[in-house]
Amino acid sequence: MAAEGLPERTCAVELDLSALLEREAPAVVAQPISGYPAATQDVALVVDGSVTAAQLLETVRRGAGELLESADVFDVYAGTGIPEGKKSVAIALRFRAPDRTLTADEASQAREAAVAAARDAHGAEIRS
């Protein structure tokens, strides 16, 4: 390397990009933007410490039904006020119908269905 005037710690790489350029890009599928507002409700569920937030989130998503647009964990807490061996997982639920504005009752029913699924699958209780 010294004969070429290059530092001792030099490397060279050759990339053949033709394989990448020849591949067809996957189609991007976008959801249409709704003209109706979302209804957001939060829920904090107390579960056994062995239940992961991902497991609980998946159960909540399945239980909430077709009106659920998104569900995101925004807090996991174990400490004062939570029984030993348990934790509280707080989840933001966003509901939306593609063809109408949801009523508060519809959003609450979907939330309750999500909570019921978590209760059945993980013994979850609403944090008071």
Regions found by a protein language model. Give the residues of each.
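A carboxyl-terminal module marker
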Residues: 1-128
